[in-house]
Amino acid sequence: MLKTIQDKARHRTRPLWAWLKLLWQRIDEDNMTTLAGNLAYVSLLSLVPLVAVVFALFAAFPMFSDVSIQLRHFIFANFLPATGDVIQRYIEQFVANSNKMTAVGACGLIVTALLLMYSIDSALNTIWRSKRARPKIYSFAVYWMILTLGPLLAGASLAISAYLLSLRWASDLNTVIDNVLRIFPLLLSWISFWLLYSIVPTIRVPNRDAIVGAFVAALLFEAGKKGFALYITMFPSYQLIYGVLAVIPILFVWVYWTWCIVLLGAEITVTLGEYRKLKQAAEQEEDDEP
């Protein structure tokens, strides 16, 4: 009887092991960690230009002046663990200096910010192994829409949330609202990854695969934030070695780790569909055998 139970358990776990083997094979073939390193490098170069463009958009709309402060604190508190305050202070200084640039310099900032989006597009389509290329004008329109509408939609959502919290009837729902706010970063990460895996690839991505891959990436991202913050707090080796410059390697390691998570979610999304196709092909071969 024990042998029968073991055989059943082995039969049920066999598809999981086959899928994990396929996932590891694709990660190795796509050089996922190298892609993550490239994206981390481009992200660090594009970080200040991207933030400068986003805050310039908020400055163009006076109604978002208060919301931009809330959005800024939300981003640094939830997406840059442990050293968010220090990084925020430095980036705000850099952005303030960039406001003194000429029109040519401002165009350079925008091009650098768009370069990050192009790199993300290229990396994800490499993982999906897509040969189809978008028209350049269409790609530019998509990048520009993300760059402009993304921050405005995020600001609008925070403004609506602040308005709802200010209503009298909301005072009776403080506990519920607190619980929702705790999981809001996870939901935001999940939705962001889902949109990334669904829209950026130039081939059709099954919606359920994108949802699963995005959920795993969101969970890893939230766990990574807490784990990274705990590591920096419990083992302050970077502060001991680099002193006041510790924020630089800490930021680089965190950005690299984040891109590893993003690309791993993409690999999971791709592998789910790939495994399903291989399984269907194997079943078809078995049916065709006499």
Curated annotation (Swiss-Prot):
Subcellular location per UniProt equals: Cell inner membrane
From the record, give the transmembrane residue ranges.
Answer: 44-64, 104-124, 140-160, 183-203, 210-230, 244-264
Q: How does it sit in the membrane?
A: Multi-pass membrane protein
User: Keywords in UniProt for this one?
Assistant: Cell inner membrane, Cell membrane, Membrane, Transmembrane, Transmembrane helix
| Gene Ontology cellular component list | plasma membrane
The domain of life for this entry's organism is Bacteria
Query: Which PANTHER family does the UniProt record give?
Result: INNER MEMBRANE PROTEIN YHJD (PTHR30213), UPF0761 MEMBRANE PROTEIN YIHY (PTHR30213:SF0)
Its recorded name reads: UPF0761 membrane protein YihY
**Which organism does this sequence originate in?**
Escherichia coli O1:K1 / APEC
Where is the organism placed in the taxonomic lineage, from the top? Bacteria, Pseudomonadati, Pseudomonadota, Gammaproteobacteria, Enterobacterales
